[in-house]
Amino acid sequence: MPRYYCDYCDTYLTHDSPSVRKQHNAGYKHKANVRSYYQQFEEQQTQSLIDQRIKEHLGQTAAFQQVGAAYNQHLVSFPGNPPRPRLPVLPTPGMPVAGSAPLPMNSPLVPGMRPPVLPRPVPGAPGYMPAPGMPSMMAPPGAPSMPMPPLNSLPRPPTMNVPPAVPGSTSTPTSGGAPSMMTQPMYQANPAGPTSGGFDSFNINAQGPEANH
């Protein structure tokens, strides 16, 4: 009787019958051999795909290198091999443009540019005028000292309108136009009554004129 040969297990079965084949195919050894057999082909196919991708990548890299080498040779062919031009730097709003004339002193400011901040001049410095209404207190070096101007020549501050005086108060304006402190009568919570006669004497005095009539 012929025997059955299993290609996966590389062995001969004892009998060539359907029951024996089914029993052999259900065994764990046969399943493991089938799994390893197909896994071997998967690994080979995967490795071949990886090698193909690597070759394609190397071919693209070689093409890029050839293009770069041709471009470098084209640059070297120029006389003097001038460097590549750089991008221009745009000036900021406050930066003066190279090659342009400076702005005059009385010209309007450029929009977006902050006006220059000048230091505060020292009083009495040469070239600076004193503030309006205030005489210069310091003399230039080497000049004789000037006398102090009288206080009456200085401008006085404007006076403020004072509200009308309260009845019973007195206010006397001073020479400068400023009112003096007003004296108001003090308010008494409990005024003192008459010492003699008490409440009856007060009523008698109040009804006296009516009795005379």
From Swiss-Prot:
Q: Which SMART domains match?
A: ZnF_U1
**Which GO terms fall under biological process for this protein?**
mRNA 5'-splice site recognition; spliceosomal snRNP assembly
Zn-finger (Matrin-type) intervals are 4-36
Q: Which Pfam families match?
A: zf-U1 (PF06220)
Q: What are its GO cellular component terms?
A: commitment complex; U1 snRNP; U2-type prespliceosome
**Compositionally biased residues, Pro residues:** 143-166
InterPro entries in the record: Matrin/U1-C_Znf_C2H2, Matrin/U1-like-C_Znf_C2H2, U1-CZ_Znf_C2H2, U1_snRNP-C, Znf_C2H2_sf
- Per UniProt, the ranges with Low complexity bias are 167-180
Its annotated compartments are: Nucleus
Which residues does the annotated region (Disordered) include? 143-213
A GO molecular-function descriptor = U1 snRNA binding
Keywords of this entry: Metal-binding, Nucleus, Ribonucleoprotein, RNA-binding, Zinc, Zinc-finger
What the record says about family reads: Belongs to the U1 small nuclear ribonucleoprotein C family.
The record's function comment reads:
Component of the spliceosomal U1 snRNP, which is essential for recognition of the pre-mRNA 5' splice-site and the subsequent assembly of the spliceosome. U1-C is directly involved in initial 5' splice-site recognition for both constitutive and regulated alternative splicing. The interaction with the 5' splice-site seems to precede base-pairing between the pre-mRNA and the U1 snRNA. Stimulates commitment or early (E) complex formation by stabilizing the base pairing of the 5' end of the U1 snRNA and the 5' splice-site region.
Subunit info here reads: U1 snRNP is composed of the 7 core Sm proteins B/B', D1, D2, D3, E, F and G that assemble in a heptameric protein ring on the Sm site of the small nuclear RNA to form the core snRNP, and at least 3 U1 snRNP-specific proteins U1-70K, U1-A and U1-C. U1-C interacts with U1 snRNA and the 5' splice-site region of the pre-mRNA.
Q: What is this protein called?
A: U1 small nuclear ribonucleoprotein C
Organism, as annotated: Vitis vinifera
